[in-house]
Amino acid sequence: PVFYKDNMYRPGENPDTIRLKVFVNNDWNWITVSLKHTDVVSIRNHRKDGKISAPMLEKKNKKWFLRFAFEGQVNLNDTKLEERRILAVDMGVNTDAVCSVMTKDGTIHARKFINFAGDKDRIYHTLNKIKKVQKNSGSQNTKKLWRYARFHNDELARKVASKIAETAMQYQCDVIVFEHLDTKGKKKGSKKQKLQMWKKNTIQKTVEQKAHKNGIRVSHICACGTSKLAYDGSGYALRGTEAGNKSYSICRFQNGKTYNCDLSASYNIGARYFIREIQQN
């Protein structure tokens, strides 16, 4: 629930306390809640950049937390198309993200592979343990394991989002370009559990919040064919056994060139963004 100011919450007498109105003993009473001094300092620092909203009470892992949100005005950049520098991001299940810094003339200024293999191994190891427990004694004994897997999955999404935003700021990009990914519906195949755990929307939303805070715009393009088509225009790319490779991350173009699939897809994402902008202008 949300604690609205004056009606549900008030500042406490001590700077590190706050008073909340809660339903206790069949009546609404004011109680004093102590906050960590480090959290209070963080709230004060954030309040300098924007307006603080009413706190919200949340329950996580059998504990209660107060979440404060901040609202502020930010001017997004309006760089001309000829001078615009973008960060094209191809997100995937095997490699978390592949980023390419591009300009309108097609020049690739930088490339970045983002992959937290250790975090994913920890998650997949936990999921395999869940399978074994469910097979032997049912699903009633897996709550703790599921909580552990979800926690590390959320942490992985935060790490990937932070790395993408840091890359955009490092190379002074004006726009971050994502694919519009829609994986709704029933998943099939051997990777259905990985797809179910893939927090692509959380990553994109977190990156958008971090980017807007620093004046960087975020755009989405159609994902159709970005991975299947070769970036050099030679046609469809062959992957995995079709190209004679054991790895699905390496592809072969129609002209015989071997290249990284995700890197080629990031080039296509950037090119598709600039084509759309040129047509609109």
Name each model feature, range by range.
Residues 62-281:
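Positively charged, helix-rich recognition surfaces that bind polyanionic ligands
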Residues 1-60, 197:
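Acidic carboxylate diad motif detector
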